[in-house]
Amino acid sequence: MAGNAGFREAKGDLRLENVTKSFADFTAVDDLSLVVPRGSFFALLGPSGCGKTTTLRMVAGLEQPTSGRILIGDTDLTGSRPYERPVNTVFQSYALFPHLTVRDNVAFGPKRRGLKNAVQLADEALDLVQLPHLAARKPAQLSGGQQQRVAVARALVNRPEVLLLDEPLGALDLKLRRQMQVELKRIQTEVGLTFIHVTHDQEEAMTMADTVAVMNHGRIEQMGAPEAMYDLPTTAFVANFVGQSNLGAGRIIDTDGDRLVAEVQGSRVKIPKARSSVHSGEVMFGVRPEKVRVRREQPEGIGDDVKGVVRDVSFIGVATQYLVEVPSGAIWSAYEQNLDVEPIDLRPGDEVWLTWQSGHAFGVPPDDDAAASPMVIDTAAED
Amino acid sequence: MSTLAHVGAGASGAPTSPSPEPAKKSRLAYLLLLPGAVWLLVFFVIPLVQLFTVSLQSQFPGYPGYYYRDVNVGNYWRAFTDFGPHFGRSLLFAGLATFFAFCLAYPLAYAMAFKAGKWRGVMMILVIAPFFTSFILRTVAWRQILADEGPVATTLNTLHLLPGGRITETWMAVVAGLTYNFLPFMVLPIYASLERADHRIIEAGGDLYANGFTTFRTVTLPMSMPGVLAGTLLTFIPAAGDYVNAELLGSDNTKMVGNVIESQFFRVLGGFPTAAALSFTLMAIILALVFVYVRKFGTEELL
Amino acid sequence: MSAPNPTAYRPSAGKRAGAWLANRFAIIAAVLVLFYLFLPVLYVFIFSFNNYRKSNIAWNPNGSPTLKHWMDPCGAPGVCESLVTSLQIGVIATLAAVVLGTLLAFALVRHQFRGRTASNVLVFVPMATPEIVLGASLLTIFVQGFSNVGLRLGFWTIVFAHIMFCISFVVVTVKARLQSLDPRLDEAAMDLYATPSNTFWKVTFPLVLPGIIGAAMLSFSLSFDDFIITSFVSGNETTFPKFVYVSYLRGIPAQANVIGFSMFAIALLLVIGGSIISGRRKA
């Protein structure tokens, strides 16, 4: 390790212990504790300003935590400099060195570590991202997608213990983004490194990651496998940030076997006990739009239902989205798959019934903050 | 004058990340700063202080060329009463030269930024290249071009467009020389600001206003204002202090304050205090004008 | 105002003629202005072939054009000595100003410290001060103050003065380059195991280098062509511009035209050559 006496070898899970980062006027990361198992693809998901990028920068060593510890395995990395950590970053704007060729960009890290075969390693990394033919070019001569791959190769070539991706696909157009998502996932499976992916795009996080952590106001709201989190959000924020939800504030008034009975703005709805993080008092009732059916007549034997008036119909190809005003004045959203040759012909102003299986409903603690989210729907359900 | 130079720092950071600049130890900053700052202190600030004290000195009676420390405000009074017209000419000629330079520079800068395409670099070089032929040589060449028997004067005389019959040794020659000599200082900042301007905004302006002139007045010109501001200062300041053009192209009736300062220092025995007072007054006037100008057109980019 | 009308980008049919004119107007005006810039240079060139008698102001049809001044550019007494002096001063002043100014620029862009605003003002004000005031103040200090420490007007006082006014221009040029650098490049380097000194020499410095080279070229041309400040602080030393100015009354020798035009030609060739090379390297 020529010229790099301070470099710390470390292997194992990445652990953040009670990490806090405060700036002059606000706390970006607030007492965060987290374990990322070795070899997993982990996504930090959240809106801008939630502290996810600051968390990433602290892992990289570009920021130092105000308090708390950052470890890989049993090695404490807190306080060490970025060049001393077995961690590499794919920057949001790629930050490729404009004065170096693609090959020299990729060989930069191995050269700094004094590896004799730096150029050979660089060429192998370029093979991995399928760009060996562009090795002699300068970054300015590459397209956005190609630059992105070079940035990935430049980080990967070092075989870091943890690879950090800071919104790496943000600058790409939709089609290229989808393609790169698949590509990154393939590379991660191939090399088996720990990937930490910061993004505000919930679809991207869910497509790629084994584990997703949703951050808000410097804290983790919920963490888990994407499917589980989508199916059963535990906070109103997650219910709206990960997918959309029809939500309504109410209170729990009764139980019915393994179900809770809640009164939501004058209507009675049921929530499975296992699907509610509150079991008494104030609750936020929720159901996902694609779980809600739209019917002309009041249906029987499905579950709970509510009457409403269609306000908007938008055809999106695989499905049709209905926006329905329920009696409380709130707007519910529902998706119907376009299975029939002639779909139900509904127009704004038509009266309909919305219905769902009560097993699909969920309950989360009430949260004023959720009202700020765009798709929150304050609703009252009528039996 | 970083309008010449101002380039938006590549701020593409996510809003979550605060300034990526780590707070570095200021000791290193002072080490970097020290040599240059000391140089500027010793060879700029201290000389100015000295100039100010000289401007208040008095002559030893009977010993021409010898002075004693004093607070002789009369030097400033003399500077104004005896050489008021020279101050007036300096400001007037410099103002005219700045205006003409703007009129000539803008089309050139505009063509460089928007019409030149791959010739941009070449044009840039061409604007700077004349600098390498000595400024004095070029000014002497203007004297030849504008001479009574030269092409410009003879043409104008044939057309009866030249009232006095000649250009050299008139204010016209001096203003022409000043305009010429400082033109590149006007072109480059305007070009820099036009080049930096977002061309799409100008296109949008072209869509909104059918009239090309309206687009120019409401969109293009305001966007190039930082460059125009820097350019006018970079032209006006050296022009107001110049004496070479007045010396080589003008006559006794077109002498500017620079000529007076130069001759008081080098050709008038005991002229030091007056010359210093004149210099200091000139600097004060120009700094005041710069200050008012920058205030009026408002830019913090200048520093 | 003789400013150009920009093209209306999607002109309605009726406006197209006006747009066409506006389009050409800028180009035509630009070519005319460039011609204006070069006209005196052309005169300097032509009169370098003049077989003049007493003063090289009027064209002498007898024996002109002649190559004799080009064959013997040092033929006039003092002309080549003044050129050498100017070149020496230019090189020394440029080197010193580039070092001092680059350090200053790094301090101002990359660091937060007390007195930063004051430092910015200290760098800016010399550029906003007329040369004659700079020259006058230096003259008073050299004659009345620094002469006590053994500094006499001459070669070194010119060098010191030139360093002073070049520093500000170096700072402005290098600062612009530094500010345009993405700070994330430094972070990326550190992330890729580069120590702070590695980061500086492998990333920051190569990226700032074009700005430093530009600053050096600017400094050299400012120093080489300076007359006003030089005339105040030069004493008996003669630089090339001072040589031309002083010999104006007696008659400027055509050798000065030869040298003046050659400097122009050399600079033009160097710059064009340089841009061709850097253009090829980019491709």
Segments from the language model and where they lie:
Chain C
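Interhelical loop and adjacent transmembrane-helix boundary motif
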Residues: 4-7, 16-23, 55, 66-78, ...
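Transmembrane-helix boundary motif in ABC transporter permease subunits
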Residues: 7-9, 13-19, 91-123, 136, ...
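Hydrophobic alpha-helical transmembrane segments of multipass integral membrane proteins
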Residues: 35, 39, 84, 88-100, ...
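A structural signal for multi-pass alpha-helical bundles of membrane permease subunits
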Residues: 39-53, 85, 134-147, 217-223, ...
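C-terminal transmembrane helix and the adjacent membrane-cytosol boundary/short C-terminal tail
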Residues: 2-13, 24-25, 115, 175-186, ...
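N-terminal signal-anchor/first transmembrane alpha helix
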Residues: 2-47
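Membrane-interfacial helix termini and adjacent extracytoplasmic/periplasmic loops
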Residues: 12-16, 58-61, 67, 116, ...
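Transmembrane alpha-helices
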Residues: 28-29, 37-41, 163-164, 170-175, ...
